[in-house]
Amino acid sequence: MAFRATSALRQSFKLRPAFELALRSSCLQLVLARWGLETAALMGVKGDRTANDDDRKVRAVEAIARAMYESGLDDHATEAEKAMLEKPYQCWEYEDYAYGDHWEAFGVLQWLLGRQHKIPPYYSNFDRARLFQGTGIMPADPSTVERFVDPFMASQTHQTLDVNQLQHEIDVSEAWLWRARAQVLLGLRKDLEMAEQQQPQQSATGIGEETPSETILRTKHIPHSLRRMARDMPKTIPVAATQARDKGLVDALEGNDFAIAVELKGNGTDNATASSAASTTTNVPYANLDSNHQDAIRKIAESRFFAFAWAVSKANKWNPDTVSELVSINPISSVWTA
């Protein structure tokens, strides 16, 4: 039976100052703007592409980098972010493209600042166009960065976010991250059990190379403290799902699992039937999703969770790669707090 803690173990969260959230949000927006240009080039989005189009994009890339320095954001951007913006157009490395996973963190920060009205379900993304519109920042224009950040710099500026609402959204992020990590462990439990049996032999022989399952756990940011739970996941997931539903952390269950709303494609022959069918959704259990969809939800959960963790200073520095060091933001994950 999974461990359950009382709500007395909760802590009162205090957000970082609004200007810190605004500065971090601005850094994310500049690099995500560059990410959009690089991703389009990588995917070969050409159309009626001309030499003038390439020149225009090169100028846009250079303008984004200048905006970072002229607005003073270079003092708040990470070294990795500055390095990405300084690279010439179409010279990004493979790992740079993973920055696209930060859209959801960008959305959470804007929600905390009151620029987004709600956080979408954890199987849906924030609307990216609305996120850019929410700040009013034109990535190549440093003055728009200042216009967004300056109102939050005043000493009397405070977030008006209700503390109970903040607590709820943190709890929701923890629940979905726990479920995403549980799915990774569920898929690897046999490999992990075998590795556990072989560990004494490896220690005796001095052989300690990373196994394929260990590589997956590392790249998918699974904390070491959770890995020993893999054997019990088939029994633990239904218990966690019921807990999450009863506490309002998920909207519904399907098959004793977190319910994922999936849109059904219509096969109607007439316009009325097709239109009606196109808007139909159904719930499926999380475990029944294919691996690509499960991975997409894991990335959404990780990104949002880390944004909350940083915003309440659970994470001291902005480095999403360290999310594997965090099991929860609360002292005990919200899934297991009564």
Show which residues each predicted segment covers.
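Extended, charge-rich alpha-helical interface modules
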Residues: 2-338
